């Protein structure tokens, strides 16, 4: 028995690398020293632009959104999701992304399918001046089923140590600015999938109340906030802290970016929760606490700032076609009049 008979096609793997080469190398900046194919990606760190350069790294996946995306042929979109989940994490430190690595594991290499994934990854990287420096595609018969794949991403960025954003400057009455999400992004899909399994008319029901395609809305790629954040920082606007709203929603992610003696007080009436979330809540009978602790509810990213910068940030976000608004403020934990992060039912 040869290797191909056992389920691993080496030649197909070589052909796949050849087919993705154009998309991958299209993301390369002048700091990439060699193209794909080596044992390690080589990247020249632009240290001349920094006094005390600090590398910031992040790794993530797309979770069980992949299950639905694969069944509906949203392969390009999950490639973008993979990049977004990593870049959105590292930019919370004020970092600029430098390069990205991907890992794709599958039961059987479907070149057409995975080419779309890599094209999505390349698109996400290219739009954010982030080089797709390398990756691994593993064909693993018997471990993954024939038509399934899993994704993991790894991103490295850079920031000057003196410009690190770590929440230490957060103070009482700072404003919390929300940046709108594209939708569900890449979290909560284990719950979403169970709701879909229990409601075989869910597409028709959603289209009836929204006049929108259910899966087009549900599987929109995660918004990448790098370009808008980069412009804000380039205009000498001080951001004291940032939070990427992912699994755990606002209640779990926002407190992570501020000192422990403060809490974020959120005005839950400051925005209208998008119809997709309200629909899922109703049709899935999701309890209020789970609703807030699972989904982003229309808020993909948060900034904590001094009030003097609010209008300038709104204008920059508008230039990037991103809705933004004041969602709350920072208060001390010992504040006797405001003792809850969110309404009591949520805490």
From Swiss-Prot:
Signal peptide segment: none
Top-level EC class as recorded in UniProt: ligase
Instruction: Give the superkingdom in one word.
Output: Bacteria
Gene Ontology terms, MF aspect: ATP binding; phosphoribosylamine-glycine ligase activity; phosphoribosylformylglycinamidine cyclo-ligase activity
Q: Where would you say this protein principally sits, based on its record?
A: cytoplasm
Location of this chain's protein in the cell = Cytoplasm
Task: Give the EC number.
Answer: 6.3.3.1
Query: Pfam families from the entry?
Result: AIRS (PF00586), AIRS_C (PF02769)
Q: Which GO terms describe its cellular component?
A: cytosol
One GO BP on record is: adenine biosynthetic process
Q: In which pathway does it act?
A: Purine metabolism; IMP biosynthesis via de novo pathway; 5-amino-1-(5-phospho-D-ribosyl)imidazole from N(2)-formyl-N(1)-(5-phospho-D-ribosyl)glycinamide: step 2/2
| Sequence similarity | Belongs to the AIR synthase family.
Name-wise, this protein is: Phosphoribosylformylglycinamidine cyclo-ligase
What species was this sequence derived from?
Prochlorococcus marinus (strain MIT 9215)
Lineage of the species this protein comes from: Bacteria, Bacillati, Cyanobacteriota, Cyanophyceae, Synechococcales
């Amino acid at each position: 028995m040869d290797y191909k008979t056992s389920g691993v096609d080496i030649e197909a793997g070589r052909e796949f690398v050849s087919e993705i080469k154009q998309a991958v190398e299209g993301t390369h900046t002048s700091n990439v020293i060699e193209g794909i194919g080596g044992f390690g990606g080589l990247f020249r760190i632009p240290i001349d632009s920094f006094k005390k350069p600090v590398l910031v790294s992040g790794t993530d996946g797309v979770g069980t959104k992949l299950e639905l995306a694969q069944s509906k042929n949203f392969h390009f979109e999950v490639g973008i999701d993979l990049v977004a989940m990593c870049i959105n994490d590292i930019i919370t430190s004020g970092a600029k992304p430098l390069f990205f690595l991907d890992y794709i594991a599958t039961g059987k290499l479907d070149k057409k399918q995975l080419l779309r994934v890599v094209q999505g990854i390349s698109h996400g990287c290219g739009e954010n001046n982030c080089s797709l420096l390398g990756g691994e595609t593993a064909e693993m018969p018997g471990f993954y089923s024939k038509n399934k794949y899993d994704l993991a991403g790894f991103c490295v960025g850079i920031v000057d140590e003196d410009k690190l954003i770590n929440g230490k400057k957060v103070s009482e009455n700072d404003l919390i600015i929300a940046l709108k999400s594209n939708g569900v992004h890449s979290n909560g899909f284990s719950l979403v999938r169970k709701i879909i399994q229990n409601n075989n008319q869910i597409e028709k029901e959603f289209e009836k109340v929204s006049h929108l395609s259910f899966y087009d809305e549900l599987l929109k790629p995660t918004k990448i906030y790098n370009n808008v954040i980069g412009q804000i920082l380039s205009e000498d606007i001080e951001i004291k802290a940032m939070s990427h709203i992912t699994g755990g929603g606002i209640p779990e992610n926002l407190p992570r970016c501020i000192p422990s003696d403060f809490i974020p007080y959120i005005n839950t009436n400051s925005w209208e929760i998008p119809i997709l979330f309200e629909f899922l809540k109703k049709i899935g009978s999701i309890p209020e606490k789970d609703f807030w602790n699972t989904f982003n509810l229309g808020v993909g990213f948060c900034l904590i700032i001094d009030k003097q910068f609010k209008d300038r940030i709104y204008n920059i976000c508008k230039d990037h076609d991103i809705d933004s608004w004041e969602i709350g403020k920072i208060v001390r934990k010992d504040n006797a009049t405001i003792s809850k992060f969110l309404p009591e039912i949520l805490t």
